[in-house]
Amino acid sequence: MNEPKIRFVQKKDLLQLVNLCKLHADYEKADYDVQQKEELLNKHLFSDHPSLYCLVVEKEGRLIGYTAYMKQFSTWDATNYIYMDCLFMTEESRGFGIGEKIMDKIKEEAQKLGCA
């Protein structure tokens, strides 16, 4: 079996990402309307100044997890920080330490974005 790969989401992944979001909502017992999600995610993830960043976990050509985060500014600390909106792994991919690897990758990306 191939090791899962953590990478930035690509436009070609948007349908799979929306499907993962639906699974995430089901897990949280929340409503999730898939209408226009691909279009809206495309707008916010792939603009010249993205308002959202997303890492996905790919295994054997299929997305098995994702995390979404944003660069924010703290008035109190007068510095930038990363706000992680969510982290979700499919049920069969949990328990293998992938979440910890995702957190390490977010820390790396936070430094690149000039966040504490």
What do these predicted ranges mean?
Residues 67-80, 85:
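Conserved donor-binding loop and adjoining core beta-sheet/short helix segment
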Residues 45-55:
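A short helix-loop-beta-strand connector motif used in the catalytic cores of GNAT acetyltransferases and
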Residues 56, 62-71, 88:
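Conserved beta-strand in the GNAT
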Residues 87-94:
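A short, internal acetyl-CoA/4′-phosphopantetheine-binding micro-motif in the GNAT/acyltransferase core
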Residues 116:
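Short acidic/polar active-site loop segments enriched in Thr and Asp
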